[in-house]
Amino acid sequence: MRLNTLSPADGSKHAPKRLGRGIGSGLGKTGGRGHKGQNSRSGGGVRRGFEGGQMPLYRRLPKFGFTSRKAMVTAEVRLSDLAKVEGGIVDLNTLKAANIIGIQMEFAKVILSGEVSAPVTIRGLRVTKGARAAIEAAGGKIEE
């Protein structure tokens, strides 16, 4: 088997419909669009969310809440990810260097998910109560 001999399995690919190629094809003349009307026209059809003049769902439902801009630049870090950081000192820059959080992140919070194996020092990150207990139980410490 070679890359140039690969082909799709029999029956897995269907030929596209050839529209407007005579009445014998079953899709001649109007090409499956019917006669007249908005959808028969070139570029015809209604916009997304349009319900035929009925008040659309996105306008029937109330507005609520907002998107926090701080949440966009805040990352959650699992306890199990802390082992991927070299040196035992974990701060925002070492997390970025280890590709655990994105470069655009400005804040990080360590959460209790997984286990911490080696003692680590956390600097300048927020830590949940459960994660704090697990880090201190493993011999690590948290510096604000």
UniProtKB/Swiss-Prot annotation:
Q: Which GO terms describe its cellular component?
A: cytosolic large ribosomal subunit
Keywords, A to Z?
A: Ribonucleoprotein, Ribosomal protein, RNA-binding, rRNA-binding
Name the domain of life this protein comes from: Bacteria
Q: Where is this region: Disordered?
A: 1-53
Instruction: List, as start-end ranges, the regions of compositional bias called Gly residues.
Output: 21-31
Q: Which example biological process does GO assign this protein?
A: translation
List the Pfam families hit by this protein, alphabetically: Ribosomal_L27A (PF00828)
Which InterPro entries does UniProt cross-reference here?
Answer: Ribosomal_uL15 (IPR030878), Ribosomal_uL15/eL18 (IPR021131), Ribosomal_uL15/eL18_sf (IPR036227), Ribosomal_uL15_bac-type (IPR005749), Ribosomal_uL15_CS (IPR001196)
Q: Which GO terms describe its molecular function?
A: rRNA binding; structural constituent of ribosome
Subunit note: Part of the 50S ribosomal subunit.
Matching entries from NCBIfam families are given as: rplO_bact
Q: What does this protein do?
A: Binds to the 23S rRNA.
> What is stated as this protein's family in its record?
Belongs to the universal ribosomal protein uL15 family.
Protein name according to UniProt: Large ribosomal subunit protein uL15
Origin organism is Erwinia tasmaniensis (strain DSM 17950 / CFBP 7177 / CIP 109463 / NCPPB 4357 / Et1/99)
